[in-house]
Amino acid sequence: MLTRTRVRQGHGPLRLRQDLQRAGVEATAALEIDWLQQAQAVCQKRFGDTPPTDARDYARRARFLAGRGFTGETIRRVLGAGRERDFSAD
């Protein structure tokens, strides 16, 4: 029950694991959750469909997702770090 509640609230796997440990529950069951899709939905709800406009905006979104408990790899994939981003104003 705690698991479903936290996922509905938009928390990621790291936060979920921490909450389960605090409650004294072992997180041995593998959750069938697409964390990338979950992170994209949380980011879209908070920031809309627009991609980060500059390095400051990128960092703000990354901090938000990290605070929600998503992994660094998931955050980079959601924010498009795989694509070449040039935030410098030439």
Swiss-Prot record:
Predominant location: cytoplasm
Gene Ontology CC terms: cytoplasm
Role description: Modulates RecA activity.
Keywords, sorted A to Z: Cytoplasm
Family assignment from sequence similarity: Belongs to the RecX family.
Entry keyword annotation includes Cytoplasm: yes
Name of the molecule in the record: Regulatory protein RecX
Location within or outside the cell: Cytoplasm
Disulfide bonds: none
Domain of life: Bacteria
